[in-house]
From Swiss-Prot:
Organism in which the protein naturally occurs: Penicillium crustosum
Residue sites binding Fe cation per the record: H222, D224, H280
GO BP annotations listed: small molecule biosynthetic process
Residue sites binding 2-oxoglutarate per the record: R290
Family: Belongs to the iron/ascorbate-dependent oxidoreductase family.
InterPro entries, per database record: DIOX_N, IPNS-like_FE2OG_OXY, IPNS-like_sf, Iron_ascorbate_oxido_reductase, Oxoglu/Fe-dep_dioxygenase_dom
UniProt protein name: Clavatol oxidase claD
Disruption phenotype annotation: Completely abolishes the production of hydroxyclavatol, as well as of the clavatol-derived compounds peniphenone D, penilactone D, penilactone A, penilactone B and hydroxyclavatol. Leads to the accumulation of clavatol.
Required cofactor names: Fe(2+)
Catalytic activity: clavatol + 2-oxoglutarate + O2 = hydroxyclavatol + succinate + CO2
Record keywords: Dioxygenase, Iron, Metal-binding, Oxidoreductase
PANTHER family (UniProt xref): 2-OXOGLUTARATE (2OG) AND FE(II)-DEPENDENT OXYGENASE SUPERFAMILY PROTEIN-RELATED
Length: 338
């Protein structure tokens, strides 16, 4: 077990190569133990040895910069609030995590100073999930070819999305190995076209400001809604994670070819809070535009969000537990007031 100088804040960089090569080997056990300890401390850890090509990582940042450099009128043609399945352009200052639990009135909420772009599994209009109006299900939308060539944007994002699906399966296998429920504990979560979202984010320089006693940030204080998140940062710092014991904020410096993995609310519920879904924020403190690429893994829409240890034991708990679709719909729509 890792020796922690600060037990309430452990955010390691873990080379997962031994786990990929032999998940039952002695070296893999060290990987598993580091991840388990991190999940119980901060719910955040960093991974290298993930086999995502560095070429592709750089390409997705280049594609992101191309899209956000388009004229606003072109981006607004893809406004995600007007598309099927919430795909497309995430307009600047539309999301506020303050709105989630009714802490403030909509008119008083500080909006995040960021813009984004969403894609997910590309489903045609006649797919049952789309035809039945399932949440976040639909076809992806793209800029017109004359605005942004498909090979410079669409093809890059589609390749990256496929790679994140692969890495998500690896991370789920690693997380399963940290738990006492066996290697198949997440099998049901991964069935039936599991829901996941890829989100490009752009935090413009110099717009964050103080509003009375509150900071208007690139992304306000929040926990992630889903099962876990895979984050790729550019070279500019900004992500901060809160120590749940001391309340202190800790920056997570960017590192090339490194992914940040964080436990989100669904996995925390599954483990009855043993694995932490920690509060974090983005503060673009440098005078540079900042970009990040986020992959939110949620899972099977019909999966019940409940503790793993009680699966199949309490019929009332099964009935009362929300599905992943219900949980994510509630959280996401509240943060956008839609």
């Amino acid at each position: 077990m890792p020796v922690l100088s600060n037990p309430s804040f452990y955010l390691p960089l873990v080379d997962i190569t031994p786990f990929l090569e032999n998940p039952h080997g002695a070296a893999a056990q060290d990987v598993i133990e580091s991840v388990r300890t991190a999940c119980k401390s901060t719910g955040f850890f960093q991974i290298k040895g993930h086999q995502v090509p560095l070429r592709l990582q750089k390409s997705v940042f280049e594609a992101s910069a191309r899209f956000f450099a388009l004229p606003l009128k072109n981006k607004l043609e893809l406004d995600s609030r007007k598309t099927v399945g919430f795909r497309g352009y995430d307009v600047m200052e539309t999301q506020s995590y303050e709105l989630e639990f009714g802490a403030v009135q909509e008119a008083d909420a500080l909006r995040d100073i960021k813009e984004g772009f969403f894609i997910a599994t590309d489903l045609p209009p006649d797919h049952p999930h789309v035809a039945n109006g399932r949440f976040l299900q639909g076809p992806n939308v793209w800029p017109k070819p004359e605005q942004l060539a498909p090979e410079d944007f669409q093809s890059v994002l589609e390749e990256y999305y496929t790679e994140m699906q692969r890495l998500s399966h690896v991370v789920l296998s690693l997380l399963a190995a940290t738990l006492p429920y066996g290697p198949h504990v997440f099998d049901e979560l991964e069935t039936c076209d599991p829901m996941s979202l890829l989100r490009l984010l752009h935090y413009p320089r110099g717009l964050e400001k103080q509003d009375g006693k509150k900071l208007q940030l690139g992304a306000g204080e929040h926990t992630d809604f889903g099962t876990f998140t895979l984050l790729l940062q550019d070279e500019h710092p900004g992500l901060e994670v809160q120590d749940s014991v001391t309340g202190e904020w800790h920056g997570v410096p960017p590192q090339e070819d490194v992914y940040i993995v964080n436990v989100a609310d669904i996995l925390s519920t599954m483990t009855e809070g043993d694995y932490k879904s920690s509060v974090h924020r983005v503060w673009n403190i440098k005078s540079n535009d900042r970009y990040s690429v986020v992959f939110f893994y949620d899972g099977n829409l019909d999966y019940k969000v409940k503790p793993l240890r009680s699966s199949g034991q309490d019929e009332n708990e099964e009935i009362d537990a929300p599905t992943i679709e219900e949980h994510v719909r509630s959280r996401l729509t509240a943060s956008y007031a839609i």
